């Protein structure tokens, strides 16, 4: 007996670019698991990369690591933030007045206090997802506690929008950071101004070229360099404050309020530059899973915040004493003899800041792949002992190309600042919206408390975002364009994969029917172990049906394996896989991975031996299906989105590579699917 075959086209056994789909909606899987548990036929095992969400101690080593990775972006903002703000109220004929400079210094300080200290360090960092932070973790928390499918979709869209803006930020950060650092050449050697752009491009090319080596070894030096950087910031700030000690009065919010009231619309424009002082605040939350709350909080409160405040106030004091210092107040705080060493230190600091954004993009992209929002791509591990240290070649060179184009197009850090703020404030808004849901539904805050606390921050974030919307014609369109394009790509991929899964469900044979007919089958059984990968554990994989059609045989031992992507950072320890016996020598295996984990299917399956289910990695053969997608007569996707989806599908990495299956153990069949 051979079960009926669905329509197909172009059967082949090769290594195509994309393999079996991995489900994103786990409803069917969970139902299968719970049913199996109730029948007493399941076993749960470990097997895979495990992690821990427990709080980490805030020792000196942890604090150094935090300074080297987390605070690079926000720590290099003094290079350009205050200069950009004061430039708005200054002109060659009418330099900024002391009260205006004090007002902007006060606005900068209170932006650091409200957005970074209170919103992120005190509040948002409480909302961890099994120890992990970041907007993806926050989105997963919000979706988990929401019963309405409509709101789940809405919160997913908010999370994806914030994520896409982060990608835009990751392109702009290396460009503006490196540019602002090398612009110091013009201060110490004015005749060398013509080499600023070429030098910035050389630094950027070098930065992205060494990504393939990983940050394991050089990362150990990041912490001490940033300790030196923040110490120098504080020392320079104190030096500047002695020029005009009254600048410390700007710690009072009355100066900020006075500036807003007296300047009206101009103060609204200035807020678009003030927000540059808090770029990188999202990194505190995103890196919480790597370092824990305590080291990040202590480093901010006792070292980073004081250093930044002193430097901003020192620059402001210098500008009050010498309005002509507006050309570059940061470097003009530095004694002439130390400007070249400071240029070198600033370049190192900006490279570290850029490195943090690039590494964060790699990690975020991996999470999105696991959640099904992006196609699989080649992921390289740069450190055999550190699972989190990864390199994505395709993403790396997309970021590099974008950063180089921005340097050539904008040419100065002050011009590029217009493109920077809107990505940062957009991410702030998305995080605030998701936090409202999490603090109300997860932490059980009263509705009134949530409305007052996060309503206030939503208003603050909205004001900053609106101020940056004014910059759209001057460069603010860049991160918006990147965000819109990224959102279209992610939603198109998600939609396309769901259409494929629905079509496979409609065309496939139920697993129960296959098992019921198997005892009466005359199909020849051959020695060996066959692993059939399937996105849906309730249906017979197309790869098995094609194997029956072409080879007329079944193996003695069969495993139907489904890889389930969880909406949590890691699978629970001891709950990596669930095994259910369907028939003699036929088992269903569901292997689960969180969005922070890298799948390793052969490693997980080796653990089956402990439960009496024989698995020999040398003898196992893996059978997968490759979808040959075409447009149906009644298409469910617009033509332009279909083109995008097919392009992504053609360039996606294979299942073999993504699940780390040995290529020489794989047999793959092509299946034609119309959507």
From Swiss-Prot:
Residues 1-25 are annotated as: Disordered. The chain crosses the membrane at residues 62-82, 104-124, 153-173, 195-215, 222-242, 255-275, 300-320, 332-352, 390-410, 419-439, 450-470, 472-492. Transport of potassium into the cell. Likely operates as a K(+):H(+) symporter. This is Probable potassium transport system protein Kup. Disulfide bonds: none annotated. Belongs to the HAK/KUP transporter (TC 2.A.72) family. GO terms for molecular function: potassium ion transmembrane transporter activity; symporter activity. Residues 1-12 have a biased composition (Basic and acidic residues). InterPro entries: K+_transporter, K_trans_C, K_trans_N, Kup. PANTHER family: LOW AFFINITY POTASSIUM TRANSPORT SYSTEM PROTEIN KUP (PTHR30540:SF79), OSMOTIC STRESS POTASSIUM TRANSPORTER (PTHR30540). It holds the Pfam family K_trans_C.
């Amino acid at each position: 007996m051979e079960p009926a075959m669905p329509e197909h086209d172009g059967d082949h056994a090769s290594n195509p670019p994309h393999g079996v789909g991995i489900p994103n909606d786990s409803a069917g899987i969970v139902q299968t698991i719970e049913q199996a548990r109730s029948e007493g036929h399941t076993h749960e095992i470990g097997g895979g990369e495990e992690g821990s969400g427990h709080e980490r101690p805030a020792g000196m080593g942890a604090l150094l690591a935090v300074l080297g990775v987390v605070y690079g972006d926000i720590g290099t903002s003094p290079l350009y933030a205050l200069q950009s703000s004061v430039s708005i109220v200054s002109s060659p004929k009418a330099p900024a007045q002391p009260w205006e400079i004090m007002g902007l210094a006060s606005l900068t300080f209170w932006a650091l206090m409200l957005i970074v200290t209170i919103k992120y360090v005190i509040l948002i960092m409480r909302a961890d997802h099994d120890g992990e932070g970041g907007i993806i973790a926050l989105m997963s928390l919000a979706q988990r506690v929401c019963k309405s499918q409509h709101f789940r979709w809405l919160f997913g869209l908010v999370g994806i929008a914030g994520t896409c803006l982060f990608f835009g930020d990751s392109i702009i950060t290396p460009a503006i950071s490196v540019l602002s650092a090398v612009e110091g050449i013009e201060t110490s050697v004015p005749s060398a101004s013509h080499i600023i752009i070429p030098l910035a491009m050389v630094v950027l090319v070098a930065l992205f070229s060494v990504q393939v080596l990983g940050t394991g070894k050089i990362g150990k030096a990041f912490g001490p360099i940033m300790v030196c950087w923040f110490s120098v910031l504080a020392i320079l700030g104190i030096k500047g404050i002695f020029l005009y000690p009254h600048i410390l009065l700007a710690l009072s919010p009355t100066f900020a309020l006075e500036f807003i009231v007296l300047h009206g619309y101009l103060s609204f424009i200035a807020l678009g530059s003030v927000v540059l002082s808090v770029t990188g605040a999202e990194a505190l939350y995103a890196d919480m899973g790597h370092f824990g709350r305590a080291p990040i909080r202590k480093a901010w409160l006792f070292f980073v915040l004081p250093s930044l405040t002193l430097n901003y106030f020192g620059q402001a004091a210098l500008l009050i004493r010498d309005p002509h210092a507006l050309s570059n107040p940061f470097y003009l705080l530095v004694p002439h003899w130390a400007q070249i060493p400071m240029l070198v230190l600033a370049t190192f600091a900006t490279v570290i800041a850029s490195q943090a954004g690039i590494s964060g993009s790699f990690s975020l992209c991996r999470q999105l792949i696991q959640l099904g929002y992006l196609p699989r791509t080649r992921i390289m591990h740069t450190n055999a002992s550190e699972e989190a240290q990864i390199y994505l070649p395709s993403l790396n060179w997309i970021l590099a190309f974008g950063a180089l184009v921005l340097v050539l197009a904008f040419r100065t850090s002050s011009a590029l600042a217009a493109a920077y703020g809107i990505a940062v404030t957009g991410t702030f808004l998305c995080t605030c919206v998701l936090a409202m849901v999490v603090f109300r539904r997860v932490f059980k805050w009263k509705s009134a408390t949530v409305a007052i606390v996060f309503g206030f921050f939503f208003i603050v974030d909205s004001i900053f975002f609106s101020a940056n919307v004014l910059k759209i014609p001057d460069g603010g369109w860049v991160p918006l364009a990147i965000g819109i394009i990224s959102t279209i790509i992610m939603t198109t991929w998600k939609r396309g994969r769901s259409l494929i899964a629905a079509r496979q469900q409609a065309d496939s044979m139920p697993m129960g029917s296959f098992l019921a007919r198997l005892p009466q089958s005359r199909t020849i059984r051959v020695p060996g172990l066959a692993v059939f990968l399937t996105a849906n554990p309730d249906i017979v994989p197309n790869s098995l049906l094609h194997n029956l059609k072409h080879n007329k045989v079944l193996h003695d031992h069969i495993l139907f394996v489904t890889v389930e992507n969880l909406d949590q950072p890691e699978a629970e320890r001891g709950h990596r896989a669930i095994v259910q016996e369907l028939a003699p020598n036929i088992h269903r295996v569901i292997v689960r991975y969180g969005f922070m984990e890298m799948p390793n299917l052969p490693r997980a399956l080796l653990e089956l031996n402990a439960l009496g289910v024989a698995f020999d990695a040398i003898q196992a053969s893996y059978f997968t299906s490759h979808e040959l997608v075409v447009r149906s007569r009644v298409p469910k996707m617009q033509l332009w989105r279909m083109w995008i989806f097919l392009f992504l599908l053609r360039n996606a990495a294979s299942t073999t590579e993504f699940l780390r299956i040995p290529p020489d153990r794989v047999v793959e069949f092509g299946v034609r699917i119309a959507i």
